[in-house]
Amino acid sequence: MPPRPSAAAPKNIAVIGAGIAGIACARTLVQSGRKVTVFEQDDQVGGRMSSCETAFGTFDHGAQYFTVRDARFAQALATAPGSYKPWSATAVRVLDPHGRVAEAALRSREPHFVGAPRMDAVPTEWARPLVEAGGVELGTRVTRIERDALNGDRWQLQTSGAGDTSHVFSGFDAVLLALPCAAARALLRASSQSALSKKMDDVEVAPCWSLKLAFPNAMQPTLCTLGPQWNAALSTHHRIAWLARESSKPGRSAVERWTVQASPAWSQEHLDDDEATVLAKLHKAFAEVTGIRAQPAFAEVFRWRNAKTVKPLGQPMLWEAGSGLGACGDWCIGHRVEDAFVSGLELALAVARR
């Protein structure tokens, strides 16, 4: 059950970021009777639990799957039936640096799930009531948090949108940042809110280059799959950490598509390389690992500057009741999808119980 609102708790709240943490936080606050506005700079919700749409089908180029360990996460998922399905963990292999299978399957038999028909189906479903109520501002980047010009006890947000348009949203009792740690820290410092940002200084998050490949010509009656018979693998190749056959996921189209995620170390080393160079190097590594030498009809890379938490904050969230500023995200406690959910939930509970 959502917490019973405290008389002193903030009633009009801004949540910056519409990833899993932001949506979990916002929906919990709405359920407790708060007015919430979510600001998201992208044109869709989901954050790293998002999908890329192409002419050859979708690619889950961020989070690849999620697991469920916290009962509260399981309860929240139950409110969005049909938006996720199990993805067989027995298909996941562990490869040596040359692409040979070193372990037949992951040691853990923990169920793996994916959004259906896209990875962002779960956050999209959770956000639906907020969107329908006009509580989500997509394509809106918050550039500064400052005290409300008309009421110094409240906050206002300076924002930018399409075509360099600017707008001020005001009257917030609390502002909650559900952003990657580096982005949250930068926004707080740009807003002269260094006290909260300093608490994030020790957090470390690694980047990740993601490669998307499509082989539509592989769809032949006598050809079941192209390349390896496994559908997903953890790789020890120096460039590649993960590979997944997108068409093996439930609800996806049959076009042969692969998502490849570079290793944290390689991604960091080549973080500022141009996309063409990264694509060529990762494609070469993909061929070495899978044995697939065919030329893809589609190839594209995407750079996640903040992908996997290396050193978490060590607590579920940050909340300053006195100022009305808070922050949440997977970086607080880990790097899993569920970690983002738990962090957003815990921040909402703390705000509601103020």
Segments the model singles out, each with a brief description of its role:
Residues 11-38, 348, 352:
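N-terminal Rossmann-like FAD-binding beta1-loop-alpha1 element of flavoenzymes
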Residues 30-54:
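Glycine-rich FAD pyrophosphate-binding loop
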Residues 46, 54-59, 168-228, 292-294:
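Central helical "cap/lid" subdomain
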Residues 51-93:
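N-terminal FAD cofactor-binding segment of flavoenzymes
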Residues 65-69, 101-127, 272-278:
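Short beta-strand to alpha-helix junction loop
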Residues 138-155:
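A conserved short coil-to-beta-strand element within the FAD-binding core of flavoproteins
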Residues 212-270, 277, 281-290:
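Active-site substrate-recognition segment that forms the wall
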Residues 280-323:
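Flavin (FAD/FMN) cofactor-binding core of flavoprotein oxidoreductases
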